């Protein structure tokens, strides 16, 4: 028996509880770039350009025109993902959720936290949304497989740092569609793609931080923090990726 769904909380709380010990949970990801190229009718150069913009949802690969792909991804995000979250959680101020998605989509690959997002709402959106509401909405987006987070890990101290952290989209095509395909920054999107690739291979993925102490121009001790793009862990395996 296969039970599918688009909400992790529903699956984990209801289905897994019902079949405890008698079933497995399988996270089905969008196509990786390698899988995409097995279907794409073209060379790797053009395939990469296509993948960066439209992502790896299987149906997009079969579509022949850009207009079809744009319309499909835009409708999917608005009419399936957002509506499902709004209806499931009875969100009255849906515009706040949409604004949050826009903020997160514009900041992939950038360190952020709830206070920063709250400040952005106040200064850019002119909204007094609370930090607790932002945290709740982020949790809803994670449960719906829209975004995932990468926590910061202090390599020398061997401990996790609470915030800031990074958020990545489950599919870059959906991220781009949400922004009207206006912010196609290849370096940031590539970072998102690498993160998704590692997770699809079973790795847990963190953002690495190395604390460095030295003397400043005044001879005083100063802390600086160097970032490692990703620390990928799988059992006894650990990889540092820059």
Question: What are these regions, as identified by a protein language model?
Answer:
Residues 6-8, 12-111, 115:
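Interdomain motor-coupling "hinge/lid" segment immediately C-terminal to the ATP-binding subdomain
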Residues 242:
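Acidic beta-strand-to-loop metal/phosphate-binding motif
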Residues 66, 70-239:
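Accessory nucleic acid-recognition modules appended to NTPase machines
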Residues 1-2:
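Conserved nucleotide-sensing/catalytic segment adjacent to the nucleotide-binding pocket
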Residues 5, 29-32, 171, 209-211:
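Residues at the C-termini of beta-strands that transition into short coil/loop
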């Amino acid at each position: 028996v296969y039970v599918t769904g688009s909400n992790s909380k529903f699956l984990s709380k209801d289905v897994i509880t019902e079949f405890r010990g008698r079933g497995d949970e399988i996270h089905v990801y969008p196509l990786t770039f390698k899988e995409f190229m097995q279907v794409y009718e073209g060379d790797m150069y053009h395939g990469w350009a296509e993948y960066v913009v439209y992502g790896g949802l299987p149906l997009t690969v079969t579509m022949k025109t850009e207009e079809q792909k744009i319309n499909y991804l835009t409708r999917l995000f608005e009419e399936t993902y957002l509506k499902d979250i709004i209806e499931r959680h009875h969100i009255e101020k849906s515009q706040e959720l949409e604004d949050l998605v826009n903020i997160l989509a514009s900041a992939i690959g950038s360190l952020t936290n709830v206070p920063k997002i709250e400040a952005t709402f106040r200064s850019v959106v002119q909204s007094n949304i609370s930090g607790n509401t932002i945290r709740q909405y982020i949790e809803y987006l994670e449960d719906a497989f829209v975004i995932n987070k990468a926590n910061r890990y202090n390599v020398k101290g061997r401990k996790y740092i609470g915030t800031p952290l990074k958020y990545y989209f489950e599919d870059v095509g959906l991220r781009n569609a949400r922004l009207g395909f206006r912010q196609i920054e290849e370096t940031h999107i590539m970072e998102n793609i690498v993160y998704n690739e590692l997770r699809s291979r079973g790795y847990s993925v963190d953002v690495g931080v190395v604390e460095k102490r030295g003397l400043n121009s005044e001879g005083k001790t100063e802390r600086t923090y160097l970032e490692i793009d990703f620390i990928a862990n799988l059992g006894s395996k650990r990889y540092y990726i820059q």
